[in-house]
A protein has these predicted regions:
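A general structural signal for well-ordered alpha-helical segments in protein cores
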Residues: 33, 65, 69, 99, ...
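Short helix-capping segments at alpha-helix termini
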Residues: 75-84, 109-110, 140-142, 167-170, ...
Length: 314
């Protein structure tokens, strides 16, 4: 599998947001997308994961994908001239050739890195997973983050497979949204010398960080970017009591944002916050009324609880 040619272990640390994609009817709402990006940059988020699961990548056309990528680069550069906020573009597919093509487009348009979900529906073997990431890495010099979310894809990157994937020359890490803490710990044990692990399950952000995770790629950070950033910073600075306090304040909101399949609740939350992201594209539906009431209550209570926090700007 060869030695690593570059050290990408420090590609980014801390808080990243799995950004929603706002729609206005059938079209991407670029005016709102600009507001979302500007807000995240102002909140000090370290990276934006664009067109992942939360961004409804499965329902955008190839033309839209290119346009969204190009737009995000332009708007990031407008509000962040230093380019401190990394842009990580979702490029995974259930066809290796398509994933490679998406990655090449992302690189051409100015991505800082790519996030590649495992192939879905095909249910490939562990060897197939390794070869999938190998081909993506061969096609680009960009940092590549593997993305494991077996509940949505039907395949699971086992720790020993991720250990092999971590040896590929430009693997920067893995977004672990498996929800299995035992597997997360074993994966961390196997890869920590080679690359990073990022929490992809908001309810597990704190334990993953405390056990050596490099950061989070968060759905909740759409609604509460400064709070998620503060959680990560508290762990980094060793203020564990503070981290626990912030996590306890975030916990009810985390739960509410997953009362239905992602991104149905988070898009409803963004609408409530005044960022009119529209409804998810079919076959996803609008949030059920009872869940909407629960989400609205959780969001109101969270903002009330956080209003006296110095960092709170959400």
């Amino acid at each position: 599998m060869g030695a690593r040619e570059v050290d990408l272990k420090n590609f980014f640390k801390g808080a990243a947001t799995a950004l929603v994609t706002p729609f206005d009817g059938r079209e991407v709402n670029y005016a709102v997308l600009e507001k979302l990006i500007a807000r995240q940059i102002k909140a000090g988020i370290g990276a934006l994961a664009v067109l992942g699961t939360t961004g409804e990548a499965a329902t955008v056309t190839n033309k839209e994908r290119r346009e969204i990528f190009a737009f995000c680069v332009r708007i990031r550069n407008k509000y962040d001239e230093t380019r401190r906020t990394k842009l990580i573009f979702g490029c995974g597919a259930n066809d290796t050739r398509e994933a490679v093509k998406n990655t090449e487009i992302a690189a051409k348009l100015g991505a800082d890195g790519v996030l590649c979900i495992t192939p879905y529906c095909n249910k490939c073997t562990q060897r197939g997973l390794y070869e999938y990431y190998r081909e993506i890495c061969r096609a680009t010099a960009l940092p590549v983050i593997a993305y494991n979310v077996p509940s949505r894809t039907g395949v699971n990157i086992l720790p020993e497979t991720m250990e092999a994937i971590a040896e590929l020359k430009n693997i920067a890490g893995i977004k672990d949204a498996g929800g299995n803490m035992a597997q997360t710990l074993e994966t961390l044990r196997r890869i920590r010398r080679q690359c990073d692990l990022y929490s992809g399950a908001d309810e597990l952000n704190l334990p993953v960080l405390l056990c050596g995770g490099a950061g989070v790629i968060s759905v909740t950070a759409n609604a509460a970017p400064s709070s998620v950033r503060a959680l990560c910073e508290a762990v980094t600075t060793g203020d564990i009591a503070r981290a626990i306090q912030i996590n306890e304040l975030l916990a009810p909101l985390n739960s509410a944002l997953f009362c239905e399949v992602n991104p149905i609740p988070v898009k409803a939350a963004m609408n409530l916050l005044g960022f009119f992201c529209g409804k998810p594209r079919a076959p996803l539906t609008e949030i059920e009324n009872e869940h909407f009431k629960m989400l609205s209550s959780a969001l109101t209570e969270f903002r009330a609880a956080m209003k006296n926090e110095a960092f709170f700007k959400d």
